[in-house]
Amino acid sequence: MPPDRSMPASASSSSAPEALPSACADCPSGRTLVAQGQCCQDFRRALGSFATGVTVLTTLDADGRACGMTISSFNTVSLEPPLILWSLALSSPSLETFRQASHYAINILAAGQQAISNRFASRVADRFEGVDSRPGLSGSPLLEGCCAWFECRHEAVYPGGDHLIFVGRVERFARQTSEAPLIFHGGAYARLATSED
């Protein structure tokens, strides 16, 4: 927090700095502050200022069962070779499934697929129930109606604080130019502006 500029400089400089708490009171885990005077919730809200697309990550587990979850931490790494990345919290129940997966698919959700995003972010027993999909190259489900699909082979995984960062090599992709993407911004869904807006 900047000093109070209404105070005389001499008074401001002679004041002892305000003691900062050693942990974030807003966090049940009591995590330490991410920056001086700022907590992890503030950090999360600031990150929410950056609009992202919404994706559903899918794969098959060791028993051949479909597994999927909503993520927004998707990005490109390289065009040659074609590499993408995404991250997953160490606390995620799906972490081991994706660590062991040799292949997975990234489904880029379209603007009308908010319900699918919510479903794959929920704790329902079968997230695929009522969702149309087809198997990809490796068997990973490709959700119907998406803007784009990236079928990937696991390339590498790196530690990243309280997350793991996964890098995938794209083996096949497809897109639908007629579909606008689903957008997430500031903790809520949004849509792209059109020329009429």
Regions found by a protein language model. Give the residues of each.
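Basic, polyanion-binding surface patches
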Residues: 2-197
